[in-house]
Amino acid sequence: MILLRHGESVWNLENRFTGWTDVDLSANGVEEARLAGKILKNEGYQFDKAYTSVLKRAIRTLWIVEEMMDLVWLPVEKRWELNERHYGNLQGLNKAEMAKQYGAELVHQWRRGYGIEPPPLDNSDPRHPRFDRRYAGLAPEALPASESLKKTLKRVIPCWKQHILPDIAAGKELIIVAHGNSLRALYKHLEGLSDQEVMELNIPTGIPLVFELDSAFRPTAHYYLADSEKSQVVIGDTAH
């Protein structure tokens, strides 16, 4: 199984909180996706199905990977549950500016804390997902106005158990293209990380992460498909 965080987005580049805002890839993000596809092809990976979110930066990353691997026919299941963590009223705001306004420690807790939710969107805010057509079929109470990583986990893990895991059990080779925090949530579940340990975990953009699973679907190994020097550089910190 391959986990892949989308390539760098325009708002990653601008150091903004992104969350559910549907921003596109930056030029560098497109190149990251192309490189990921090239690496996967060169390593001989083949897939039977792909999962992604309903946000274009993840979808476009998957498109590019498929094209690079000559897998444009690949069945794709788009799941809103794989969306990035919702950053509430912080979405669109610059993190450095927020640190000056609210203090670096509070902003760090908003970003990396496990159970802390950023200030929520008002229900009348046009940025609220209730006004977005792609979520029209969901119950209003399912749509977040803000999320902690803990809350994100509560939608990602049911998606894993109800949709992704049955495909793995059926013998399908999968690629999951999603977001920093939805992948952190899945990583926490798979590896049994503590709440404190997951706070220190960062998933870099555009680098394929391999998870090898045993017959009981427990991880036996995980590793990035990239040279160690690049991994060390990008794993440090990337805006969400």
Swiss-Prot record:
Listed A to Z, the keywords are:
Gluconeogenesis, Glycolysis, Isomerase
Give the matching Gene3D superfamilies: Phosphoglycerate mutase-like
What does the record give as its pathway?
Carbohydrate degradation; glycolysis; pyruvate from D-glyceraldehyde 3-phosphate: step 3/5
Molecular functions per Gene Ontology: phosphoglycerate mutase activity
Q: Name one GO biological process term.
A: glycolytic process
- Site Transition state stabilizer — annotated at 179
Where, by residue number, does substrate bind?
5-12, 18-19, 57, 84-87, 95, 111-112, 180-181
The record's section on InterPro entries has:
His_Pase_superF_clade-1, His_PPase_superfam, PG/BPGM_mutase_AS, Phosphogly_mut1
Principal EC category: isomerase
Annotated EC: 5.4.2.11
Reactions that this protein is recorded to catalyse = (2R)-2-phosphoglycerate = (2R)-3-phosphoglycerate
Q: List, from the UniProt record, the residues annotated as the active site of this protein.
A: 6 (tele-phosphohistidine intermediate), 84 (proton donor/acceptor)
Give the multimer and partner information: Homodimer.
PANTHER family referenced in this protein's UniProt entry, alphabetically: PHOSPHOGLYCERATE MUTASE
UniProt lists the family membership as follows: Belongs to the phosphoglycerate mutase family. BPG-dependent PGAM subfamily.
Task: Read off the NCBIfam families from this record.
Answer: pgm_1 (TIGR01258), PRK14115.1 (NF010713)
What job does this protein perform? Catalyzes the interconversion of 2-phosphoglycerate and 3-phosphoglycerate.
The protein here is known as 2,3-bisphosphoglycerate-dependent phosphoglycerate mutase
Natural source organism: Nitrosococcus oceani (strain ATCC 19707 / BCRC 17464 / JCM 30415 / NCIMB 11848 / C-107)
